[in-house]
Amino acid sequence: MNRLDYSGVKPDWQDAIASFFASQTGRVLADFIKTREDAGAIIYPPRPFRALELTALAETRVIIVGQDPYHGPGQAQGLSFHVPAECKIPPSLRNIHKELQRDLGIARPSTGELTGWARQGVLLLNAVLTVEDGKAASHAKKGWEALTDSLLRLVAQDSSPKVFMLWGAYAQSKEPLIGQHHLILKCNHPSPLSATKPPVPFIGCGHFSRANVWLKQQGLEEIHWEKFTDSEPIQNSFLF
């Protein structure tokens, strides 16, 4: 398996990815990952570009910026905050579910899946797309950030208005990449370490309802936040 095979991503991302891997930074990153694999390192996720496979640039309406993948077995799937159905829901994602319930009256799901969001135009993009087993941030500052920054710029340069959700200081460091005609929502990271603390607690931020109000004002379709998976029925919520 070629972990860096991006042939499955949506066509409107492919030129940016090809340009990156043709660059010196991209070649260094590819060499680093191959060297680590050859040394026996266990690297997650198996499909680093999954977010770009599920959400086309042209269909992106909301961007949720993550930092790097989960580093436990079977967790990371190439989508920020998402875990597959068989995995225990991580604490940050539990707080996302908690805020959805508080904000929109959405019942907390039994799954940590977010593919239903991705297929509606929510780009779940981590800044770093690979990690080694048990070693958080082990592939940070190896080159991924140059690619994902370029993707964020590409999204921001698109003429269609978008919502950027920047949770925590790291995600907020990406704000200079974003243009003024988009809605930027900022608060603390949903981690239990910061979700209820100043300056802007995640619990109580109201980002999900605020995003939908703004999208509707722009003449765009709202996100059905209760649709966590492809098969999930749409629930009624408190947003009118």
Predicted regions and their residues:
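Intrinsic-disorder/low-complexity regions
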Residues: 1-4, 235
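Generic N-terminal amphipathic, Lys/Arg-enriched alpha-helix
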Residues: 3-17
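A polyanion-binding, active-site-adjacent surface
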Residues: 11-12, 19-166, 170-178, 183-188, ...
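Acidic, low-complexity intrinsically disordered tails
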Residues: 233-240
